[in-house]
Every structure is written in C-alpha cells, then in structure tokens.
Amino acid sequence: MSDKTVAVLGATGVVGQQMLQCLEERDFPVGRLVPLASQRSVDAGRTVSFAGEEVPVALAAPDAFEGVDIVLGAADDATARALLPEAVRRGAVCVDNSHAFRMDADVPLVVPEINAADIASHHGIIANPNCATIIGLVPVWPLHQ
C-alpha cells in the first residue's frame, strides 16, 4: 500500500490520541498526517506526537480535507455529521467512531472481526458500533455462526 494522507478528526481527544497511537504501532503507511481539532486547540498551539515528530493541529473545517485519502473520525456527533460528508465530497474515505452515522442505512456498520466484507459497500463513510457492543459481539459471533 502506498503512503496515504491521513486526517484524524478530533486528534487532541482521548480517542483521537489512541487512533494516532494505533497508526504508529501498526506502522500504517502515513505519508502525511493531518491532525484536526477545534478552534480552541488550534488557538492553544496544540500539537500531536506522531512518528517522532510534533505535528501542529489544524482547524477541523471542510477545506482541511483537500488531498486527504483517509479520515479517522474521533469527534462528537455534530462535528462528524457536519464535516465527514465534506471530506467524502473531497475524495476521502472516512471511518467514524461517533454515533452520527450508526443508524444510517447507507453507511455500513462494521466490526472487522465479524463483517469486514461490508466495507466494500461503503459510499465514503464507514461506521463502527459502540465499544461495548463490539466487546459483546466478538465473543458470541462464533455461536451465531
């Protein structure tokens, strides 16, 4: 896989920080990282640590998604609903951790250990269920099969 431009929406929050850590630990081919957060984080001069560097946080706004290949969403529902469709319009594929798209019939709700193939039917946004749901489903999935 070639290096990707990856944006993390909500990069300064706890979930966003974990996403960054997972990207780094799994040696995901990030060519350029675009950490996005609120105006408050930008005004405070926040940075995120990634691959041994401090990367400045940019404002989460529609134009921030220009040239982005993948967006990992770790923002609140309202921010996700407002910005992820904008990212898709600009060509990104979004994996969202908020509640915003979980019940949307056009958005696959994916637990990779169970229904990873559903990713193929996405229209730009892929949702994941609540963490407690994932924890409950993974061990009982073999019983269902």
Region locations from a protein language model:
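N-terminal Rossmann-like NAD(P) cofactor-binding subdomain of oxidoreductases
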Residues: 1-145
